[in-house]
């Protein structure tokens, strides 16, 4: 999380810094973004930046935490809401995903995240997010335990792979929200009912 010096700044200055960082990560992936561009936009020194954030990644994660939603947490909430009915949760999940991904003010952030995410970033993000998450942790832990038990655990890894690839393709191929939902519903129907009909 940001350093204490950041939180000691006046609210107006904090917001200016966050907006500059957000703009940088809307316009560039994490591999192309730079502290240099951020401090030049703000008219501050590199030294000042490092009194607020440990590194560029921490500033990136701060924006992700503030501006985006963790999709697996959306799914876990739906799974819990539907009393463990996996198929119902998956049906609603597609609608929630499409609604969130295609918000105009968030689209660029999600695009740069899903096209340029790496295992190293994922590990750092998990550490950062667990320290700062704002969801009801007890509720989420109960839901997470349900889906991580036994055979469900491997199945959830499979669903995660399917969904992440759909999201990545949606950005690579510039899908609309409608096209994304069409692909999502088709692939989830394969999960539910198998491939027999399309192979015959």
PLM features: what roles do these ranges have?
Residues 13-21, 38, 63-71, 75:
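Generic hydrophobic, amphipathic alpha-helix propensity
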Residues 165-200:
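C-terminal peripheral helix-coil segments that are non-catalytic and often amphipathic
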Residues 62, 76-103:
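Hydrophobic alpha-helical connector segments
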Residues 2, 26-31, 36-40, 62-65, ...:
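N-terminal secretory/targeting leader peptides
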């Amino acid at each position: 999380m940001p350093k204490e010096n950041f939180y000691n700044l006046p609210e107006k200055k904090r917001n200016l810094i966050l907006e500059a960082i957000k703009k940088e990560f809307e316009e560039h992936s994490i591999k192309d973004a730079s502290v240099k561009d951020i401090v030049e936009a703000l008219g501050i020194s590199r030294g000042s930046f490092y009194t607020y954030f440990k590194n560029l990644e921490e500033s990136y994660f701060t924006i992700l935490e503030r501006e985006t939603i963790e999709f697996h947490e959306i799914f876990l909430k739906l799974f819990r809401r539907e009393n463990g009915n996996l198929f119902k949760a998956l049906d609603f999940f597609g609608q929630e995903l499409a609604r969130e991904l295609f918000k105009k003010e968030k689209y660029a952030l999600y695009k740069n995240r899903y096209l340029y995410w790496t295992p190293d970033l994922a590990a750092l993000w998990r550490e950062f997010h667990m320290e700062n998450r704002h969801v009801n942790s007890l509720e989420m832990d109960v839901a997470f335990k349900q889906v991580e038990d036994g055979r469900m655990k491997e199945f959830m890894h499979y669903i995660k792979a399917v969904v992440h690839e759909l999201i990545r393709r949606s950005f690579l191929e510039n899908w609309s929200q409608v096209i994304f939902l069409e692909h999502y519903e088709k692939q989830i129907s394969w999960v539910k009912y198998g491939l027999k009909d399309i192979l015959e």
